[in-house]
């Protein structure tokens, strides 16, 4: 039997004062986090988020990966950027005042932390990668999927202080294996959503097209900005599924960009070019990444073998001594969506890389133990889960694809 709705009644309903009225702008909607999921757009996005999460576990479990829970509180900085939330119990007492003065003066030492809960510096994790690597050496193929935190004071549409990361690690795998896994994973998640959330994707795509038309008609910049918030994404999703991803090295990418600039095919931000001109050794900016994916190849692009200067110490050094076995996947409509690498399994090279990047060798002694007591070639990647949901839904602001976004000042 199929149930049919004949009568619907709501209680305590006062439509005159409901703040999430039709046509409300996303910026205003974010002021009502507890109510915004009742709107059609946000409920579509959250159903897509659910499907992406389910597809993630299904993809890895079907391929024999083991799910590992990595710690939320950690002592190591995986990214080496230092933008971490510190965890301490010292601020509730008189010792806390002394601790804060020492912290501001840069004079904290081991004796200070002896009074703290963990007896040493502790932070909210920025990545589970280093921890999940320990299990790849025992369980072979593993992945972690959990919350991560960045104390990066960036109040933009691309950054969150709390977000979720998917980080698989494959034993006996090189960078090519890693790239194939990442491509298969992206295609799997998108295909799953296309199959199971077709109505949601089509609804969001139609809404985005209407907003794009309204932006085009707006007479001033303020009006265009008010109509923003969504991008028609259906064509980009179909491009991902259409065929193999384009592959190129970082050097080839730079050469292509320089050639197209010289030939007058593209012009990049003059202010950025003045500060940091396009050249070999420059970390690709978002405008470079999107140009390659959207204009040159019109499909996702896997860029490999980046200069070692702006990549992490754990990435395997190439024979040229200048580049590392790193990769980024650049997707049309969003730019970088996945970053990964083959890990450095040679102990002497790893220890030197830690020193070269002015990291504390003692902090990573346990990580070096993974090589010291036997290891295998392995690789992995990281994907910001909210970036994936953004890509599937077409939402332009990352704060609109997570139930309760955390960002500076929120």
Language model segments and positions:
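Class II aminoacyl-tRNA synthetase catalytic cores and aaRS-like
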Residues: 1-410
